[in-house]
Design a protein with these regions (language model features):
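Ferredoxin-type iron-sulfur electron-transfer modules and their immediate structural context
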Residues: 1-157, 161-169, 177, 185-187, ...
Length: 199
């Protein structure tokens, strides 16, 4: 849709693309069809070389198209962008007990924890994230492999340690560290990270 519109040069149809990508009233992948269309709209803007729209103000998808349509223009930084409301706020660097916990009497996970972060609640182990120092001793000691390490895929893939967390728990790029390699983009399972194109 985006390529067809770009090659036709008729940018007036840009506002309709999110409705063509997400037709009807039922969402395809997220909790709301409106959220899906908003995300599709931001992806269209980035595909056209435009910047993300500020979340707190209402702007048209086509806003800024006049400047972006200039053939000799380079993209405006940043190249790699996070659509904030598309971010799923994946857990960041934490150990969690899964349903595989057998509540064994050995309680090796609890015994090896240097901070006393592992407790037993209703016969199953639980990790107090406020006390946990993420050493991984509990996970290594569990004979059932019931303790897993959760890390944001985008953050784990970033070799520059440029992915952080904003005040809402959403992923945020530190552009002073980011080299725009795209590893976060490739590894995000929710499609929240998008690079700019210059169609």
């Amino acid at each position: 849709e985006v390529a067809r519109m770009a090659y036709s040069g008729d940018y007036t149809q840009m506002e309709d693309i999110p409705f063509r990508i997400v037709p009807g009233t039922n969402p395809l992948h997220r909790e709301s069809v409106f959220l899906e269309r908003a995300i599709a709209g931001e992806r269209v803007r980035l595909a056209m070389g435009l910047s993300l729209q500020p979340v707190q103000t209402r702007t048209l998808l086509t806003e800024g198209m006049d400047q972006a349509a200039i053939a000799e223009q380079y993209y405006e930084a940043p190249l790699v962008n996070i659509i904030p409301y598309a971010c799923h706020a994946c857990p960041t660097k934490q150990y969690r007990v899964t349903e595989l916990c057998q509540g064994c009497l050995a309680a090796s996970c609890q015994r090896v924890c240097p901070k006393g972060a592992v407790k037993f609640v209703n016969g199953k182990s639980r990790i107090d994230q406020k006390l946990c120092i993420k050493c991984g001793k509990c996970a290594k000691s569990c004979p059932y492999h019931a303790i897993t390490y959760l890390e944001r895929p985008c953050q784990a893939a970033c070799g520059m340690d440029a992915i952080g967390v904003d005040e809402y728990g959403k992923a945020k790029i530190d552009y002073d560290l980011c080299v725009s390699c795209g590893q976060c983009l490739v590894n995000c399972p929710f499609g929240e990270i998008v690079d700019k194109s210059q169609i």
